[in-house]
Every structure is written in C-alpha cells, then in structure tokens.
C-alpha cells in the first residue's frame, strides 16, 4: 500500500461546499425553530428505519438510523446527532484520473447505543439523461467524537482506499475533517492525494457534503453531493 499524509493540505473550509455561508446563517437561528423546521421537512421519514436482518437473535442491539427507534444515542455522540439517518441524492465527481461524472448516493449513518457512529455509503453512476448506469464506489467506516469535540473518522472503500480523518464541528450543523493518512492498495487510484471533507445541513435541511483533494499543490473538488433524508 502507498501512503500520503496531509501536511500540505490547506485547513481552509472547502470552497465548493453547497451554500456554506447560508448554512452558517441557518445555524444561528433559534434552536426550537431549527427543530420545528427539521420536523416538518422530515416528517415523511420519521417512521422509517433500517430493515432488520431477520437472521436470528444476537445479544447486541441492531443498528438504528432513526433516533426515535432502537437504543438511545450515546451521550458522547450528541455533537454528531444531526447526521444520524438514511440520506439519498445526487452529486458530481472529478476523480483522480481527471474523469468527471454525475452519481447517485445512499448514505447510512447509524448507531447501536455505543460511543461511535457507523458510516456506509454506496454510489452509482448517472448518465446525461439522469439514468443510473451501474454501481460505483462504496465506503464503510466509523465516526467518533471526544468530549473536546475532536472528531475521528476512519473508512475503507471498495476501490482500495483506507483513510483516517481528524476534524471538529464547524458549527452545530456542519463538521469539517482533514485526512491524516491516505493509503491506497496496488490496484487503487494512483493519483489520490490527501484531502478534506465537510458535511453540513443546508437551509433546506438536506445534507450537503464535499470532498477536496490536494492536486499539484492546491485543493481541488473531488466529490460533492446534496442528499435528502429518507429515513430517521
């Protein structure tokens, strides 16, 4: 495996994050008003959750992506609470080979009552007519956050990438992360540099995220998407 560190990666907020300034302004609204807006926007998703596996009982709780169902969220995760759910939408990619394409994404962020979140993303390519053409990259990983609001995210992808990200909340509705270690297998993307990600709730309560990568000494867009809550 090859490794790149993020010493040269800028600590600035990703410039292409959807509606970043609007998201900051939205974060300043009264807490009760924010809850009311979210409840109205997500009422159709409120009763949905991950389907049970149905393969027999195990002595640990099932994962839940709905804070109203299953085990209570661990107190240590309150700083990441708004992320929990099943999200789905579309985005744009500029991969390490220079190819640009549209993609669809389903992102599941769940918990089982322990002090971490599970992270599962699956993407599919979309053609010029908006039709899905087949599976793309999958990611699985975990989020943790310390009492000092220090975030750790680890993940591995189906195309041979393993990364460690560190970060912190940008505000109550956004989280910024920067890669500390980027490892690529022999068959993985050769030109993938260190990067940074930002996730945040937008004014419409959708989840926006952007991944930027270091290319020839500057941060450039890699992937970004806007996702609607479909469960949780």
Name the predicted role of every residue range.
Residues 97-189:
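Central antiparallel beta-sheet cores of small beta-barrel/beta-sandwich binding domains
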Residues 2-116, 214-232:
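Amphipathic/hydrophobic helical signal segments and adjacent flexible N-terminal regions
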Residues 58-65, 121, 145, 177, ...:
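A generic structural signal for ordered alpha-helices
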Residues 81, 110-111, 144, 168-169, ...:
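Well-ordered beta-strand positions
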């Amino acid at each position: 495996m090859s490794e790149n560190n993020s010493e040269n990666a800028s600590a600035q907020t990703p410039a292409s994050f959807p509606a970043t300034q609007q998201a900051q302004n939205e974060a300043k609204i009264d807490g009760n008003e924010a809850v009311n807006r979210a409840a109205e926007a997500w009422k159709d998703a409120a009763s949905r959750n991950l389907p049970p596996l149905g393969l027999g009982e195990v002595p640990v709780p099932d994962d839940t992506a709905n804070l109203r169902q299953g085990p209570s969220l661990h107190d240590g995760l309150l700083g990441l609470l708004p992320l929990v759910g099943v999200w789905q939408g579309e985005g744009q990619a500029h991969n390490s080979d220079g190819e640009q394409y549209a993609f669809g994404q389903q992102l599941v962020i769940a918990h089982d009552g322990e002090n971490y979140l599970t992270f599962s993303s699956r993407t599919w390519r979309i053609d010029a007519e908006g039709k899905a053409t087949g599976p793309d990259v999958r990611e699985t990983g975990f989020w943790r956050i310390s009492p000092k609001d220090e975030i750790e995210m680890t993940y591995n992808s189906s195309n041979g990438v393993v990364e460690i990200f560190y970060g912190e909340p940008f505000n109550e509705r956004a989280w910024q992360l920067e890669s500390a270690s980027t490892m690529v297998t022999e068959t993985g993307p050769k030109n993938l540099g260190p990067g940074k990600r930002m996730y945040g709730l937008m004014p419409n309560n959708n989840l926006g995220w952007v991944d930027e990568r270091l290319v020839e000494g500057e941060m450039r867009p890699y992937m970004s998407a806007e996702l609607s809550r479909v469960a949780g």
